[in-house]
Design a protein with these regions (language model features):
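Polar/acidic, low-complexity leader/linker segments enriched in S/T/G and N/D
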Residues: 1-72
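Short, charged low-complexity linear segments at domain edges
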Residues: 200-232
């Protein structure tokens, strides 16, 4: 297949509402192989373009997988994929212009990921604190120091490769903390969560590309309805991310999202 034909086919797939995962698998294999060949030739502009194309393919493919995981009520697996998509988007949007964003609807994926995440009941996360011996540049291998950095900028593309700082030389674990705003959102306590808000939406959507937006409302519930909730449990209001005794414990009525 000629290069132009391959790129046209991938472009058509990206602009379609197809949910056939085998098509995305084949497209990803093709663009990945092509990217490797172009990188070896040293064509930086084309390599960078192919990386962008590959990344938007990954984002779309992962979002389709996420949608059907949600339909199957595999909530945690979907949550993990949502975070991966969020990271992919953060890297991609640093390396594309407005025309690319509009053409491939990057803003749609960014907004829809945030919308799904807002419905999940996870409020507390585990966070690992560690001392990293050193970081190196993924492009040139240079050891990163405050006063001795290489020419490559973190998060930018170089010949179809993303510059990241790689933890090297081992690390020393210091602590595991419970936090409200984690670096890694997949580290959650495995509890019996209420996914009714997530399921309410997923059960009503027909396609991953159906547009929707959450609007949260509240209702007042008598404090007596929560007499069985321990004061050290998370507050039923689910808004403050505080334990019950530090939030709504002494109120006559509690505002409850529904």
């Amino acid at each position: 297949m000629k290069l132009i034909d391959m790129l046209n086919n991938i472009d058509t797939l990206l602009l379609s509402n197809s949910t056939n995962e085998s098509h995305y698998k084949v497209a990803l294999e093709e663009v990945s192989k092509l990217l490797e060949n172009i990188q070896e030739q040293g064509d930086e502009d084309l390599s960078n373009f192919l990386w962008k194309l590959k990344t938007i393919l990954i984002i779309k493919d992962r979002y389709i997988k996420t949608f059907f995981l949600l339909k199957d009520k595999k909530h945690y697996e979907a949550w993990v994929l949502l975070e991966r998509i969020e990271i992919d988007i953060s890297f991609l949007e640093k390396n594309v212009d407005e025309d690319f964003i509009k053409k491939y609807k990057l803003d749609f994926y960014k907004e829809i990921v945030e919308s799904w995440q807002s419905l999940f009941p996870y409020k507390i996360f585990f966070s690992i604190g560690a001392t990293i011996k050193q970081y190196t540049c993924s492009i040139c291998g240079h050891v990163i120091r405050p006063r001795n950095k290489c020419i490559h900028k973190k998060g930018k593309l170089y010949n179809g490769k993303l510059c990241v700082h790689v933890a090297d030389g081992g690390c020393e674990l210091k602590e595991i903390s419970m936090v409200k705003n984690p670096v890694q959102k997949s580290c959650i306590p495995m509890l019996d969560y209420d996914y009714s808000a997530v399921d309410f939406i997923s059960e009503r959507l027909q396609s991953p590309f159906d547009y929707w937006k959450p609007f949260k409302t509240k209702k007042l519930i008598d404090r007596s309805e929560f007499n069985t909730v321990d004061e050290n449990d998370m507050c039923p209001c689910k808004e403050s991310k505080k334990i019950f005794k530090e939030c709504c414990f002494n109120k006559e009525k509690i505002e409850f999202p529904h």
